[in-house]
Amino acid sequence: MSQRRVVITGLGQVSPVGNDVQTAWNNLLSGRSGIGLITRFDASDINSQIAGEVRDFDIGQYISGKEARRMDVFIHYGIAAALQAISDSGLDDAENLDKDRVGVNIGSGIGGLPSIEATGKTVLEGGARRINPFFIPGSLINLISGHVTILKGYRGPSYGMVSACTTGAHSIGDSARLIKYGDADVMIAGGAEGAISTLGVGGFAAMKALSTRNDDPATASRPWDKGRDGFVIGEGAGVLVLEELEHAKKRGAKIYAEIVGFGMSSDAYHITAPNEEGPALAVTRALKDAGLNPEDVDYVNAHGTSTPLGDANETKALKLALGDHSRKVIVNSTKSMTGHLLGAVGGVEAVYSVLAVHEQKSPPTINIFEQDIEAGCDLDYCANEARDAKIDVAISNSFGFGGTNGTLVFKKFSG
């Protein structure tokens, strides 16, 4: 039996560069950073005091205040992005939609860390009897999917993946396969994160993973630049509506792009330090799944976190996977503007990769002041200015702690 084709019919996102897709995309193309000093809590005793915070976000646009108070902020972001994507797709207006065939898979790398932190403080101050009865369901990672299914009445597969910073990519790739293999006709898929808290920022700072460029937040995230000194933590959510092609055509849905490949791998090397073989294997497997060659790739939305080791390693991995063609590909890191959204990043960067294909534009990688050629970072990173380009095939890379890797392949749709 031939596999069914899967297309993207809806996009939604909440991020440091905007609380809807169009605002975020416009800001990315303009090279506007969403990174600033932390306002969410007093970070004065942490050496990294900067973050890509979501600003001016109103969950009341999506659910009631009573409901919102019962859940952590990462669930807020996930619900908002999901409802945006569903609205964009026109699913609510579809006639005779079989909701038994619509599922949701929106994951998170960390989950309800702010709620866990606040509840821990409550217990220390007043004992276990003061724990909010909504603490557990308000912190669980699969509850983004759970809330969306309840809000929309979807009775297809519902779960939430957890694989550190590869979560969003894994959620999307896994969901596409559910459709290909006939387990669903539509999947709402992506990732969400809201870990800008004392524990979240302090934990990564203790690992010496974060940038300490507190005097100039907007230039702190600088992938492949010689002066990069760590990543900048971010937050938000990115969600796609994935749909079986004939199902989408039948209801006259607009189609942004087709998802044609998904590859996964493990480094089998180190909990936090990367190696090039694992990521290269994910790219190679994704292209094989898509039935494409390295020479077919036009654009890479790279993991590109702005860490000294990670950026050089990903460049090596791309050279290993794409060979000489790696020098002809646009390699872009939107994290230079959003920061690193952890488990949400595969979702938001999938949104941006789909838009790169649909709009035939690459956002810039900002803050490349002196490209780190000495470390081998010598590819075309679309430095500092957006670019019109022929982008028929885009890949999106996500790598996470534990050596988990995921690559998605998106292709310009043609009947």
Can you say where each PLM-predicted feature lies in the sequence?
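ACP-dependent fatty acid/polyketide chain-elongation machinery
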Residues: 1-67, 246-258, 351-365, 411-415
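Conserved catalytic cysteine-centered active-site region
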Residues: 1-3, 37-80, 111-174, 183, ...
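Condensing-enzyme catalytic core mediating Claisen C-C bond formation in acyl metabolism
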Residues: 5-9, 36, 215-290, 299, ...
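Conserved small-residue
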Residues: 10, 28, 82, 104, ...
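Acyl-CoA/ACP chain-elongation machinery
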Residues: 39, 183-229, 262-274, 304-311, ...
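Active-site-proximal alpha-helical scaffold in enzymes
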Residues: 78-91, 141-144, 149-152, 157-193, ...
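Phosphate/pyrophosphate-binding loops at sites that engage ATP/ADP/AMP, CoA/4′-phosphopantetheine
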Residues: 85-98, 248-255, 283-299, 321-325
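Glycine-/small-residue-rich "gating" segment that lines the acyl/pantetheine channel
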Residues: 125-132, 170-173, 177, 194-250, ...
